[in-house]
Amino acid sequence: MCSEHPLAVKWQSKIIAMVSLNKRCTFQVGENPADERTLTLSSASNGGYYISLRPFVEPKGSESELPYEWAFAGSPKSLEAKKVDELRDDINFNFDFDTNVHLNAENTHRGVVETHWKKWESGLVEERGQVFPFGPDKQAVSFFELWQPIDATRDEFVHISEKSVDQSAARSVVLALDDDNYRGLVITVGKWTQGILFKKAEHTAKGINFLRACESADGKITTLLKYGVDFDRFPSTFVGQKDAELQGAAGAFWKVVESNL
């Protein structure tokens, strides 16, 4: 399986080893005009852990408090997929991490999100689905997203092509934290790292933390997104052997739950 979809998925209960990094190009909700106000990246590990961070490029008004359209993440157990044909796939998500749910935001979909994917001739990938923000028995809201698969082994946005490095050989490391007060997930694919950290008892913007970083050709790590009052609880290094523990601030220990190093 090549990197054609924004998330590594479980095909008929079998995990297909791959990493993926994808940049969203377009977003449309209902009958509203298509637009893109964020720099959204979705990444997934060989084993199917996934994360999507969606920061606004130019936050407006109250968006400045939490300048993200949305963010979510999950383990392989939180998604299921079925291959329809060579170009189309169905993926059902039940996120482990969802900023809207954590914030107890009004008009928030809860539970499984059913999505439908189709690869275009250009290599872009279409995603369509429906959510039920007003309740499962209320009016559905349709959405459309368009994704560009990115070469995770490069430190810049280079789209996947026949000349790209085999993405299944790219670095794939996942860190997880779950203690009395916090839970989080950090996923590194190739040169790109994204992380999410929730404070369990804090259901405001103060309980949410995000990380995005990229490693350059000389090995230097550049932090691209840094958000949250507990950001320093993220580890200072993002890679390690399976079952190793990496430390953040204030005694936060992150366990390596997946690694191909």
From Swiss-Prot:
Keywords: Cytoplasm, Nucleus. Coiled coil: none annotated. InterPro entries: Hri1 (IPR031818), Hri1_N (IPR038744), Hri1_N_sf (IPR043047). GO terms for cellular component: cytoplasm; nucleus. It is found in: Cytoplasm; Nucleus. The keyword Cytoplasm applies. It holds the Pfam family HRI1. The keyword Cytoplasm applies. Belongs to the HRI1 family. This is Protein HRI1. It comes from Lachancea thermotolerans (strain ATCC 56472 / CBS 6340 / NRRL Y-8284) (Yeast). The gene is HRI1.
